[in-house]
């Protein structure tokens, strides 16, 4: 069942009913100011950090869902009132449409012949949202309405805002000047920032105190001021500051009225905080408001935003026979990669924006799907991540985006973390050819007195694994590896503690991870190549010895007969083995080890992937492990705390499905690779949205597995490494156009029935227009490549860096 449709020409998903299976959201903002907005205008905005600089308030896990946002109430002459976004009033509308575009959302609602259309977006180089409201009278009689705007301010620190009521009920402060409401809570003391909400029209009243506007016992659906048709002109003093403009408007027959609201954020230099004692300096806010006085100003900024996305998405465009594949690669997958890079895992409708910041493992993987768009941002992120490493090569698990300082709020000691830095750095160098990044001086633990080159950071990442091997010579798992919930040293009996942050019960010198072994080989090969290209042959040989040894160790101690083991627990017992009662086979080592090339030559790789298909496959994707754990295993940790079929306990953890798709291309099975890719890709799931529930235009982290009552239901959409890895899988391994240190490799591995495809790729200062033909209907293999009319040797397209377009013909066979 569908609840909308793709508008590929305008690069929008169009939702035609407010009653979707779950709120379907979008993200606004490209730099420092970001917003989450649902198809009903719910959500919130923040500056840089969703925890420390939350601007508007939102209530998670609320009834009804999606409570709090940017609301407009239209009150008609007969007392009927409604919201064009349907929420929060939920009055029936004769027309509803929400268009989620790239960095903007347009919502239209109509009732009684009056249509209201609101375009929400964050302009480029702007710290605020624009709300462009157009009221159209579609009748032949004049319409007199009372319009109320509404947003509720958060008192900056989102955690404190929802917990420290004894203080917060007494701190709220505002200023009102003309048609602008300023939120200045705590500005009198340590803060130098404020927010504001403005409208480009004279107002007939206002409210800034929530209780005065709402009434103590009313909800968003029926504020007392709207019910009665009169604002209170309230000035907040403590309690809950809001911003509500009241306008009395007349719209002529078949005429329209246009209004521009700005929800903005301003920081003032300490010496310029005040206009005069007690009155904030509004200079910057007035400049922001002045920028959007007319509809033409709005359209110009929206056009600039769309052109920005034109340029970014134009760096990779594909043309295949499959329109769903085209729209995912050309539009939505790249868009999601940008969002995950900007937001990491911090703020969504499943992440509160409070506990999680920029994850080390997460963000290094996000770079893989983002680096082609804005490589300079990827470069800075790599350096920021390296700066939270410790001198032994280990690292904090995350940093707070506002401070860029590492913290252990969601735990530490995840022994896979350091290796991801090698993969992101190598991806950056392959994309850009910029080897100078390795010479950048980066501190350890943000300590300027402890600096080393980025290359030295990579070296310590590599040797952290070498120096932390267990009894079998496999890497020690620490608190966990990529699977945060496989806690082999935790042994938690206390329900009041977190698996991720509690002190491990054991010293961690026994439990080993086969997954990290595969990751070490994959990243280690890159480290060896980097050393060689830097002329460090001795370093390269030494590192290569460790990589070869790990391959041998994995084949000897990490192979279970039909698939790769998952781990050894704290007692040296196998995890993910046919010997286990439950949890006999796990997906992660099968994908990672084969991606790393382990077992390809001796047939183990094919056996492992065949076992994945036999034991882990479902109509909705590959489950993480089987059989699901039916009880709590204290020696395994959080993974066994979930009911069967959910999350890590045999849910379809979409993030690792692309690893298996890539692994299938390693052994040349294009049909199977594309089948795995397609099963979790949202555009292919649009027709079953009532089952899938989350947005049909972005990937979700998790889909309920076959052991779950709600098999096929997705959760945790948007902020997931699935986005980056799916983009890597389809563009670099299935379509097979991937950056190398020397140029663009063309090595497709596609379904045999494909006739071919086209891909345009901007790479290192040139544009490659690549046409792949598959007349013999093979899955893998390149017979010849012709560049600009000349046949080349091998499969790597040269680096031109000449600003020109180069035409490439690839013949498979």
Swiss-Prot record:
UniProt-listed CDD domains:
GH94N_CBP_like (cd11754)
Q: What is the native source organism of this protein?
A: Thermotoga neapolitana (strain ATCC 49049 / DSM 4359 / NBRC 107923 / NS-E)
pH note? Optimum pH is 4.5 to 6.0.
Q: Which residues form the active site?
A: 484
Under Enzyme Commission nomenclature, its number is 2.4.1.20
User: What keywords are assigned to this protein?
Assistant: Carbohydrate metabolism, Cellulose degradation, Glycosyltransferase, Polysaccharide degradation, Transferase
- Highest rank taxon of the organism: Bacteria
Q: What class of enzyme is it?
A: transferase
Statement: the UniProt record of this protein carries the keyword Transport: no
Q: Name one GO molecular function term.
A: carbohydrate binding
- Matches recorded under SMART domains: CBM_X (SM01068)
- Protein's job: Catalyzes the phosphorolysis of cellobiose, yielding glucose 1-phosphate and glucose. Is inactive against cellotriose and the disaccharides lactose, chitobiose and xylobiose. May be the primary enzyme for processing cellobiose in T.neapolitana.
Name by which UniProt lists this protein: Cellobiose phosphorylase
Summary of temperature dependence = Optimum temperature is 85 degrees Celsius.
The entry assigns this protein to a family as follows: Belongs to the glycosyl hydrolase 94 family.
Record-level GO BP terms: cellulose catabolic process
